[in-house]
């Protein structure tokens, strides 16, 4: 089983990202689970969402405390939250940032096995006209993890958002997929 934990802020679409990743894996014939964790969150407050993917039915129903993959939608969270808490030794961290690999690693409390960075904010602004990075960051997830194909991400996005909005969001994911830098550490 692969467990993915998303870190974002209220209103950024972390929950939607977790759901779209689950749908993309489902489209590939996998068993999935996606769910948010809500405390007293409000717009702008830190939010956590989770996705589990497996080749067999998933029976566990808890939050994800030891993720295989951590996805950070808002780079300011690197200063506010220990996003690597519980990260497995072979873990992957994916960060939306314009900063360098070295700058990101300085902020992580635990060094991942693999780090992926992409400026999903700029991609979202250019394509969507809004700094909502949830669909763009899924392109980085596809590239860095190989969990799902980018085509499955695009299809799941178009299932979630209809018409031109779906097309633009799928394009944002594809562009992020192409621009993501992946570093083996």
Curated annotation (Swiss-Prot):
This is Pyruvate/ketoisovalerate oxidoreductases common subunit gamma. The keyword Oxidoreductase applies. Heterotetramer of one alpha, one beta, one delta and one gamma chain. GO terms for molecular function: 3-methyl-2-oxobutanoate dehydrogenase (ferredoxin) activity; pyruvate synthase activity. It holds the Pfam family POR. It catalyses: 2 oxidized [2Fe-2S]-[ferredoxin] + pyruvate + CoA = 2 reduced [2Fe-2S]-[ferredoxin] + acetyl-CoA + CO2 + H(+); 3-methyl-2-oxobutanoate + 2 oxidized [2Fe-2S]-[ferredoxin] + CoA = 2-methylpropanoyl-CoA + 2 reduced [2Fe-2S]-[ferredoxin] + CO2 + H(+). Its EC number is 1.2.7.1, 1.2.7.7. Keywords: Oxidoreductase. The gene is porG.
């Amino acid at each position: 089983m692969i467990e993915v934990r998303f870190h974002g802020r209220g209103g950024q679409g972390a929950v939607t990202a977790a759901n779209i990743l689950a749908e993309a894996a489902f489209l590939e014939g996998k068993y999935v689970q996606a769910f948010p964790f809500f405390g007293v969150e409000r717009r702008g407050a830190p939010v956590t969402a989770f996705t589990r993917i497996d080749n067999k039915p998933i029976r566990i129903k808890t939050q994800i405390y030891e993720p295989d993959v951590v996805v950070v939608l808002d780079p300011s969270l690197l200063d506010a939250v220990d996003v690597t808490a519980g990260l497995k030794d072979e873990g992957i961290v994916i960060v939306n940032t314009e900063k360098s690999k070295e700058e990101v690693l300085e902020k992580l409390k635990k060094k991942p096995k693999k780090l992926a960075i992409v400026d999903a904010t700029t991609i979202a602004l250019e394509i969507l006209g809004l700094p909502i990075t949830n669909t763009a960051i899924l392109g980085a997830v596809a590239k860095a993890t190989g969990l799902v194909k980018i085509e499955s991400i695009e299809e799941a996005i178009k299932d979630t958002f209809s018409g031109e909005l779906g097309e633009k969001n799928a394009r944002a994911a594809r562009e992020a997929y192409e621009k993501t830098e992946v570093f083996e550490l």
